Amino acid sequence: MYTLNWQPPYDWSWMLGFLAARAVSSVETVADSYYARSLAVGEYRGVVTAIPDIARHTLHINLSAGLEPVAAECLAKMSRLFDLQCNPQIVNGALGRLGAARPGLRLPGCVDAFEQGVRAILGQLVSVAMAAKLTARVAQLYGERLDDFPEYICFPTPQRLAAADPQALKALGMPLKRAEALIHLANAALEGTLPMTIPGDVEQAMKTLQTFPGIGRWTANYFALRGWQAKDVFLPDDYLIKQRFPGMTPAQIRRYAERWKPWRSYALLHIWYTEGWQPDEA
């Protein structure tokens, strides 16, 4: 067992609930007190389990034997997924009143940027539950089942999805253009044109993402938020955000959000998940 540290406050109930709502069957298992999933690091495969210890402000990580040779990489992935490097005092200090209601919110990341890109594309114009079901179907068809844990499937690699038949993907329940967008994303990952870690210029990288088939501004921003764990992303034209700022245009909302730099990703989360929040007079 390995142990990672985090700074309180941390709303583990919210984080695990967020991940549970999006959990991909046969890839992830989420319960009230733990998170488990299949994981691939290079040629190594296995299952990782994360168990928060609220009293000690630690996260216990169990790795199956197949992942032990790449333990450091696995721990780094878990740290990014759960945003363990966040200093909530600094973030909440910058957010002011906005951060007061839910000071333990963290930015859910991911264990792999390509996987998050696939999930972001499959989440377009469908419910959270439907997106998880679609992703599970893709994983069942193109993922690799673990010999030691046959109940788990490793998320499909870029190589597998790049070679996919778009009609076979369409048959899973998605539009053909979305299937083609997945294949293009897989090829971009293989060619190195999809950054796997946060790029130096996030704004430019998001603009580049929008040149990919099937990726618009919202998807590019959401991918930056979760795939790269970019800390300063805001979505002024998001449906719920526009509801929270009645009577304001996206340009006005963007200007209002400048006050939360360089932590606008956290501001976005707080606005999404704080019922009844209203902006101050601009």
UniProtKB/Swiss-Prot annotation:
Changing residue 237 to N: More than 30% catalytic activity, methylmethane sulfonate-resistant. It catalyses: Hydrolysis of alkylated DNA, releasing 3-methyladenine, 3-methylguanine, 7-methylguanine and 7-methyladenine. Induction: Up-regulated by methylated Ada in response to the exposure to alkylating agents. The active site is at 238 (proton acceptor). Pfam families: AlkA_N (PF06029), HhH-GPD (PF00730). Transmembrane segments: none annotated. GO terms for cellular component: cytoplasm; protein-DNA complex. Coiled coil: none annotated. It is an enzyme of class 3 (hydrolase). Its EC number is 3.2.2.21. Gene3D superfamilies: DNA-3-methyladenine glycosylase AlkA, N-terminal domain, Helix-hairpin-Helix base-excision DNA repair enzymes (C-terminal), Hypothetical protein, domain 2. The record marks 218 as: Determinant for substrate specificity and/or activity. GO terms for molecular function: alkylated DNA binding; alkylbase DNA N-glycosylase activity; DNA-3-methyladenine glycosylase activity; DNA-7-methylguanine glycosylase activity. InterPro entries: AlkA_N, AlkA_N_sf, Alkylbase_DNA_Glycosylase/TA, Alkylbase_DNA_glycsylse_CS, DNA_glycosylase, HhH-GPD_domain, HhH_base_excis_C. Keywords: DNA damage, DNA repair, Hydrolase. GO terms for biological process: base-excision repair; base-excision repair, AP site formation; DNA alkylation repair; DNA damage response; DNA repair. Belongs to the alkylbase DNA glycosidase AlkA family. Hydrolysis of the deoxyribose N-glycosidic bond to excise 3-methyladenine, 3-methylguanine, 7-methylguanine, O2-methylthymine, and O2-methylcytosine from the damaged DNA polymer formed by alkylation lesions. Monomer. This is DNA-3-methyladenine glycosylase 2. It comes from Escherichia coli (strain K12). The lineage of its organism: Bacteria, Pseudomonadati, Pseudomonadota, Gammaproteobacteria, Enterobacterales. The gene is alkA.
